[in-house]
């Protein structure tokens, strides 16, 4: 006997459905056994027989109310059913609920919105019996998809009316269809209604799918209707309930179907898709879990797991199981709140209830087991990166990218999510109690020794002062109590038994307070397990019992664990040592100091070391952290900063190899050690000769020296080179006053030679300035300007100020040297302009390549590095020379230096960008050329000669004007150095902006 459900008009029912809507949908369990027995007599049609051939494709009735109406629909659990049919129904229902996360609602298969609106209109009209058509391959005996598409021509509305009229005659328990035509005419205009409202009407008015199929096929067989009429009546029914994602044609096959506007269902418009969308979940739960093909559509109800023998046939892609587990948990809690309330406390996405063998929880479990087995040994030596959860500077690490000039090489290597565990935490793992088998996470929660934290021990002492008292009366009572037993142990015949009993008494020892009441044992931590234990002797394998064999196996596992931890500690120490050696090498060989912190950070990221770096001039503070124990190890890397272009190139090559995982750390450490121990390319005596050659080459083009001044400058330059390479290197005390003493010696000799024949043959200013050109602070100015550009204010300000003070030292030495010779010779010359300078400018530029080559060789550059250095230096000098020829620019030192530095920066950036070389090494000689040229334009290096003349003159009377001029003359050289520094800095900034307008530099100017 069929069950009927009364309903009102469509308009009124839709309003009631909206009012009675509940946000949490409960899907009750269904008892279909009795209902099937009642309908067994009427299910003899061909369509029912075809339905029986399907395996486990039993339909499920969805009630039109959340509360049970009769005994057929019950909220009781399906496990209480006794019949075999009910058990099959139970498996199917629970299987559907458990497999909800495995359905795919692919976003790229969703059709146009007008189709979805038409589906909603059909749902709202209440035509649950005849507005759906089954897919063509749902029943194998019904024909192919091409036949169905060919038979779909005709008036679909009239077919639907005939089907409804026949259902009214046969099924008396169904609802009255008097308003069928009016509701059907309204169905196409209801597309703009709320989808949730249409879903409620669909859920409240659904009947058993199998019942509809049986009664509809019986009417069609009696009236001998065509196959097209039958397929048209059921296609829309089951495509709303089909659990299989079918591929429908994207457009109607003919013009008649286009006129009818037959909607093609999207995967999100199926019944289960609408139910899932009501729970706040968008789309499907497992996108891309199944594959589709137009040639052959698979019945996924059979493949997903409704048959025991075919439970693993679904083809899955790589999924995010944690996210799917959370979605499945939300669905269960939304649709089955009773079951969700029975979940144990602390259930997470990793611990799902085992609903069926094909549920997503099994997939998560299997994936986690395989992943844990593969990475179990590696995970114990890793800790989370403190940059994510302690320091919180991951989002702020690229703030420097706001400045266009900065190198964005930091973005190439992201900070790792996990870093290598520190040395201290690894040592704690090595010496902790192996029997407890606690993981490394126990270091943050519970103490390894004793099982209690220090806070628990301190709380115990405060809560129970009697137990923490220093006067332990319980020991005295126990001595009296156990005294006879201990005396009995001394009997010769009871030695073994007494020892055993004594150990049992000690293990079962009780503690009492002063009143004699028994109290708990004092909760004191034990450190006896922290000592390393000697391995026990292992007997032969054939004579070992099973229990002893297990102990030996456990002992071997512990030994393997200790070996792994020991190797890990050695590896961590090796990596940390490599980082400090790399830092020392970069500082010693003259790497750009403004990049040291970033390069050290990149190296630590690649090596998975938690390292923090802070640079100060002459010192690098290195901190290696241990996130497990919240400790850090701080090192100070201090070294005398020098300049060695060849070794700097080798260090850069080693650094690049480690960064790009081309060179292992062991081999890189060995190469660094060899590089640090390696001798310089050129001997000190050769460098002294190059000093003299460079001094002679700079004299003509920078300080307007004559041909006679070249050999004199060569000899004086040899003296300066000898003082620097031999005297200063052997005496730390003299190295502090090297600049002053060198300037004194050079000025004294130059004034003595220039005074011959009143300066007719030799130029005093050219000889003095040319000999001091190689010790001018050109490199200090370059590094200081780069640090200021990179917003490293501390180091940049210190270097720039040091360059100014260094220049004042030189000026003071020049004044003192000139005064010393003035006291010796009263006829000493004081002119600062040369009479016999080279007039042809074409000859002056020939000395620039030679001076650049001497600078490169003095700084230990390779011969193959000299060509690019010479080209850049010559181009920069040409710009400075012609800028100085202009009348308006001749007196503006900072502008001429800016033009020269701009040209040098452009060529250096282009060389770095095209040739992938070191821009700083190529630019360094060119910057050295710019500094003497800028100083010579003002002739401020000899500004102290006027003060020297006043010191040696007989007139001791001075005025305020002369005092002011003296003070201005003494500071003139420092002011000139400031102007040159500003011009060089601005020129380098502008050149970087010109070559890298978007700020992206892989091996640009400010990288190595």
Curated annotation (Swiss-Prot):
Location(s), subcellular: Membrane
Basic residues bias (residue ranges): 483-498
Any Gene Ontology CC annotation: membrane
Biased composition (Low complexity): 70-85, 215-225
GO molecular function, one term: transmembrane transporter activity
Topological category with respect to the lipid bilayer: Multi-pass membrane protein
Region span, Disordered: 1-273, 342-384, 477-506
Keyword match Transmembrane: yes
Biased composition (Acidic residues): 116-132, 143-161
Matches recorded under InterPro entries: ThrE-like_N (IPR010619), ThrE/Ser_Exporter (IPR051361), ThrE_2 (IPR024528)
Comp. bias intervals (Polar residues): 95-111, 188-204, 346-364
Biased segments, Basic and acidic residues type: 162-186, 205-214, 226-239
Protein name: Pheromone-regulated membrane protein 10
Organism in which the protein naturally occurs: Debaryomyces hansenii (strain ATCC 36239 / CBS 767 / BCRC 21394 / JCM 1990 / NBRC 0083 / IGC 2968) (Yeast)
